[in-house]
């Protein structure tokens, strides 16, 4: 049951990822960053878990993916600035998020498409899990990170294709 309520537990969990993202830029030390990635991962899991049990809201449907993408973007950007990842690795890690943002804008501008159709789908969830795994790898086992980048690229291509097909079907139906 979707509601227009703003202060739901899932929304608060999603919102909590925004200050976690900001903190990622300022905390020093690997341990503190591991805690931040862990908290972001847990809040993402639990807000989704609660939403699947009926605690959904219109705001949450928008807020959750924005919070996810913001946390990953800020964290991987911090690693880029610090020289821990290359520019190409950075863009591969955020490629699905860039494509989703562009798709959202296109869906908003074109008749027959509804940007609210951008709901969480399995391919996108796989990308998010791999992105969070990549952040953990950069902090705990940096040598593993390069092996995750091609997996993120493949999963991102899958997610982008899935969203593109979904939008195409939506446009054909309208």
Show the residue positions of the predicted features.
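A feature for the membrane-embedded catalytic helix bundles of lipid/isoprenoid biosynthetic enzymes
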Residues: 2-5, 35, 66-174
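N-terminal membrane topogenic signal
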Residues: 2-15
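Proline-centered helix-kink/hinge sites
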Residues: 10, 19-22, 65
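Membrane-embedded alpha-helical segments that form the functional core of polytopic membrane enzymes
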Residues: 19-59, 75-80, 89-91, 147-157
């Amino acid at each position: 049951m979707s509601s227009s309520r703003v202060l739901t537990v899932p929304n608060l969990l999603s919102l909590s990822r925004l200050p976690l993202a900001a903190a990622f830029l300022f905390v020093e030390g690997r341990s503190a960053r591991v805690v931040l990635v862990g908290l972001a991962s847990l809040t993402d899991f639990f807000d989704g878990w609660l939403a699947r049990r009926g605690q959904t809201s219109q705001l949450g449907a928008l807020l959750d993916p924005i919070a996810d993408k913001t946390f990953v973007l800020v964290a991987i950007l911090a690693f880029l600035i610090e020289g821990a990842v290359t520019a190409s690795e950075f863009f591969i890690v955020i490629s699905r998020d860039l494509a989703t943002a562009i798709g959202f804008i296109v869906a908003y501008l074109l008749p027959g498409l509804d940007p609210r159709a951008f709901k969480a789908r399995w391919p996108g969830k796989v990308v998010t899990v791999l992105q969070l795994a990549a952040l953990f790898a950069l902090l705990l086992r940096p040598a593993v990170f390069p092996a995750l980048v091609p997996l993120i690229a493949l999963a991102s291509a899958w997610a982008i294709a899935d969203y593109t097909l979904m939008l195409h079907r939506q446009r054909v139906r309208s």
